[in-house]
Amino acid sequence: MGGVTLEKIRIGIVGYGNLGKGAELGIRQNKDMELVGIFTRRNPNSIKPLTEGVKVYSVDSARDMADKIDVMLLCSGSRTDLPVQGPEFAAMFNIVDGFDTHNKIQEYFESVDAKAKESKKVAVIACGWDPGMFSLNRLFGEVILPEGKTYTFWGKGVSQGHSDAIRRVKGVVDAKQYTIPVESAIELVRKGENPELTTRQKHIRECFVVVEEGADKERIEREIKTMPDYFADYDTIVHFISLEELKEKHSGIPHGGFSIRTGRTGINNENKHTIEYSLKLDSNPDFTANTLLAYARAAYRLNKEGVFGAKTVFDIPPAYLSPKSAEELRRSLL
């Protein structure tokens, strides 16, 4: 295989928000891939891609390009978009997505799997960093330390969903919400003390909020702090700031977190062990997009071998993520 020019994997991107833009840039770093087109629900003429020469199409015209795209990256939201788009696109393409509503993954998997099996395509779902990379590390932790406890901490980072929830409060102009892990809780876990931690003991939510002139700040703060599913179960800090300060100091989309497994071995369980995987990301969408691209390579290869149906990170051999041959991997990384 050495010296032979391989055909490039032809990638399509559905959705051109932060994740779609991250995928477009990520393709530049993967020499075995090329971007065929971006698909949007907006007016295609209103979008100016970062890459010269890349065409933008209406999402409705995707079905006409089934023979021109090897893998479609679905860079849409998990709440309302992916539950519809996942099955729809799996009926036509190999797909990859970062579906991240944890408690609905099995239901989503089943709906995508049915369509991918009908079309004989591969659909890799939920393969960002959590679910995704963290999921793999939780699995490794459980099988290596069967008697133990798994902990996941997120942050410090911007939560897009929580920021959106604040923006929906009457009188709010704009907002950013940071999820912050509680350091003392992480230290207890790292010591192998296996603490039972409540939601409130693991994370703090810090909000930077811009409000309309004359808005009732007390009411807004109360509405944020008591919002079910988002803030009611957490210690929440609310800061009211100007729009200028929000743009100047809070325009990035950083994130990160820790996946930790603690356990014991030995005749009397006297030996403590800790497995820790952590991420510190300047750009959550850029990093997530790069994980989707690695799994796009795997989806393409598996489908070439005659595999089809929905898959998760648990089902994909790690070697399929890499552009290197099996021999190169053994020589360079094993």
Swiss-Prot record:
Q: Under which EC number(s) is this enzyme classified?
A: 1.4.1.16
Question: What SUPFAM superfamilies does the entry give?
Answer: Glyceraldehyde-3-phosphate dehydrogenase-like, C-terminal domain (SSF55347), NAD(P)-binding Rossmann-fold domains (SSF51735)
Classification from the root reads: Bacteria, Bacillati, Bacillota, Clostridia, Eubacteriales
The induction text for this entry reads:
Constitutively expressed.
| Complex and partners | Homodimer.
CDD domains, per this entry? meso-DAPDH_N (cd02270)
Write out the function statement from the record: Probably plays a role in lysine biosynthesis. Can use NAD(+) only very poorly since the activity observed in the presence of NAD(+) is about 0.3% of that with NADP(+).
GO MF, one annotated term: diaminopimelate dehydrogenase activity
Temperature note: Optimum temperature is 65 degrees Celsius.
**Keywords carried by this UniProt record:** Amino-acid biosynthesis, Diaminopimelate biosynthesis, Lysine biosynthesis, NADP, Oxidoreductase
Reactions catalysed: meso-2,6-diaminopimelate + NADP(+) + H2O = (S)-2-amino-6-oxoheptanedioate + NH4(+) + NADPH + H(+)
Instruction: List GO BP terms, alphabetically.
Output: diaminopimelate biosynthetic process; lysine biosynthetic process via diaminopimelate
Q: What is this protein called?
A: Meso-diaminopimelate D-dehydrogenase
According to UniProt, this protein's pathway is: Amino-acid biosynthesis; L-lysine biosynthesis via DAP pathway; DL-2,6-diaminopimelate from (S)-tetrahydrodipicolinate: step 1/1
- List of residues binding substrate: 100, 130, 154, 160-161, 179, 205, 255, 284
Q: Tell me the InterPro entries matching this sequence.
A: Diaminopimelate_DH_Ddh, Meso-DAP_DH_C, NAD(P)-bd_dom_sf, P5C_Rdtase_cat_N
**Into which family does the record put it?**
Belongs to the diaminopimelate dehydrogenase family.
Positions with a binding annotation for NADP(+): 16-19, 40-42, 75-78, 98-100, 127-131
From which domain of life does this come?
Bacteria
